[in-house]
Every structure is written in C-alpha cells, then in structure tokens.
Regions:
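Exported/periplasmic ABC-transporter solute-binding proteins
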Residues: 29-64, 68, 72-78, 85-88, ...
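Intrinsically disordered, low-complexity segments
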Residues: 1-4, 37
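Bacterial N-terminal signal peptides
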Residues: 11-22
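N-terminal secretory signal peptides and thylakoid transit peptides that target proteins
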Residues: 3-13
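Sec/Tat signal peptide C-region and signal peptidase I cleavage site
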Residues: 24-28
Length: 265
C-alpha cells in the first residue's frame, strides 16, 4: 500500500461529522443515546434521525465509523444504544457473546459501486474493463477502497476485485480508507483515479455532484446484509429509534439512498 497525501479542502462535505458524535438536538445532547452506525449510513441515517426527532421530539446522537471498529469498542464497553452494522455477521458474534439484547433485525441490503471524480481519465463501468485497461497501461496512480480488515464495504470491494482478477495487480496503487466514507473522500479527492464505495454514498447529493459511478455486479461478492441490534444497556429513546427504523417513513428514506429493504419484492 502507498501513503495518501492529505488535502485540507477536499471532501469536506463528505466527512463532516465522520467518526464524531453529532447531536440532533443540542438541548438534549447530554441524555441522548448514541447510535453507532456504519459509515455507509452517513447521509441516510442522518436524515432518518432528523425525521425521528421532528416526529417524536426525542434526540439521538450519531457516531459513524467502520463496523469492525465499532464491534471492538462495544466489546470494550462503549455505551452505545443501537449498533447498525454493515455486515450482520458482526451482530451475530456480539449476540453470541452476550452484548446485544437479541439477534437484531435486518434493516437494509447494500451495494457497491466504482466511482471516479469529475475529470478522471477512468470511466466507471460495471465490468471494470476501463480499470483493467488503465491498470495494464500503468495509468492508475491510486485507487481507493475501505480497509477490508474491519470495514464490510472494503471486504466486499476486495471480493469483487478478486472475482474480476484485479486484486493483485491493484496492490501497488491501493489506498485504504479507515471506513467507506473515508474511502469515498480518497476516491473523489483528485489524487486518485477513483475507488469502490457504497452505493448509498454515491447517491448522496453532496457526493454525486463530485463524480460518476457504476454499480458493480452483486454476484461478484457476498451480500451486504446490514443488521441492527439494541445493546444491553439501551434505554427508551434508543428503543424508540430502533422501532422508528422499521416504519414506512424511515424505510422510504433508506430506499432513497439505494438500499434494498427486507420484506420488499
């Protein structure tokens, strides 16, 4: 892997609030439960939380990061109310070890895309043919994904690239984001030809304005079955938010960010 140069002004809209707890209602910040949400949910769950607060008057705080890192923090005693994972396997492991109330609920199925910044010589195509051509010609300087060691969207990106036969050849130019939102920042920075990110991020207006994308075939990787669960210490507001996630209003918001929803179709 190669180091990625930082650019202060790049991707400010992408990472606003990333990994930081964001209050939905300042007056209730002290008592509001923390929702630990996978980074692919950055825009979708922010919108859901705003709708939840507007409808119920109850506030939550949002913390975005990689699913694997959150799972580790929960095991170390992090006081989250709800854990919204990008891969249900993490919920299953936590439940087996007694950290969640129950096995939780599937709330969404995610997709991955190849996305390139405006002006990139790389054209996004679902079969990654342009990526292969430019890589063979030595014309890819950097290509971004989330870290597959702990970020499910990085895991699925790796699986897709292995399926396509490009994983090994990309290693010299690969840059890893700590989570998929940071990978999107890297991919759209102008210092990279592009990257593989969450479809839900690519659809957000703040991101869509910065580049173009193509959906990667679902059969190139394992499904992104996204599951949530209440943690053992969750209180009434966390319970209310968890229930709200399953309402038509919340589901409509999630669908608007490209998620397939359990029970549809």
């Amino acid at each position: 892997m190669i180091p990625f140069p930082s650019r202060r002004a790049v991707g400010a809209a992408l990472v606003a609030g990333l990994l930081a707890v964001m209050p939905m209602q300042a007056a209730a910040q002290r008592d509001a439960p923390v929702i630990a949400a996978a980074s692919d949910l950055q825009f979708a769950i922010t919108e859901v939380a705003q709708a939840f607060t507007a409808e119920t008057g109850q506030a939550v705080r949002l913390s975005f990061g990689s699913t694997g890192n959150f799972a580790r923090q929960i095991r170390e005693g992090a006081p989250f109310g709800v854990f919204m994972a990008a891969d249900e396997a993490f919920i299953a492991d936590l439940h087996a070890d007694g950290f969640t109330r129950d096995a939780g609920d599937l709330y969404a199925l995610g997709r991955i895309v190849i996305m390139v910044p405006e002006g990139s010589a790389l054209a996004p195509d679902a079969d990654l043919d342009a990526l292969e051509r430019m890589l063979t010609a030595g014309e890819i300087a950097r290509f971004a994904i989330a870290n597959p060691e702990h970020a499910p969207y990085g895991m699925r990106a790796r699986e897709a690239l292995i399926s396509r036969g490009l994983w090994d050849d990309l290693q010299p130019v690969m840059v890893l984001g700590e989570n998929v939102s940071q990978a999107a920042q890297f991919a759209l920075s102008g210092n990279a030809a592009g990257g593989i990110i969450a479809y839900s991020l690519a659809l957000a207006p703040q991101v869509a304005a910065r580049g173009t994308y193509a959906l990667i075939p679902e059969d190139w990787h394992a499904p992104l079955r996204q599951r949530m669960a209440l943690l053992k210490g969750a209180g009434p507001t966390a319970e209310a938010f968890y229930a709200y996630m399953q309402t038509p209003e919340a589901r409509a918001i999630m669908a608007g960010y490209g998620f397939d929803l359990p029970g549809d179709g």
